[in-house]
């Protein structure tokens, strides 16, 4: 991926020797994942769980699959799934998610 020169220089300042590997990582294929809805009864078993997430799994899910359409699973990258784990909001707490589109993190936090 080609980045503006200023972007590259900024990350070289921040990351030093690790900057090249960081910038090269943008050429890697994105990791696909999904999370299951713990409020739905599961009759399917899933393999390849994402560490440190209670409902996350690696893999692809079609938006047209019965599991997705019925709300059993939701496509969501691993990093987005970690937000709820880190935030751990308590009941009744108000949360403002400034990156809430299409709403996956918001539904997970609810």
Predicted stretch roles:
Residues 1-108:
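Glycine-rich nucleotide cofactor-binding entry segment
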């Amino acid at each position: 991926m080609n980045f503006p020169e200023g972007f590259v220089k900024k990350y070289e300042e921040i990351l030093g020797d690790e900057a090249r590997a960081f910038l090269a990582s943008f050429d890697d294929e994105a990791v696909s994942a999904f999370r299951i809805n713990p409020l739905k009864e599961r009759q399917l078993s899933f393999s390849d769980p994402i560490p440190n997430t209670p409902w996350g799994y690696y893999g692809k899910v079609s938006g047209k699959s019965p599991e997705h359409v019925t709300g059993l699973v939701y496509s969501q990258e691993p990093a987005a799934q970690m937000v709820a784990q880190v935030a751990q909001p308590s009941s009744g707490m108000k949360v403002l998610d400034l990156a809430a589109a299409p709403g996956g993190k918001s539904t997970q936090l609810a």
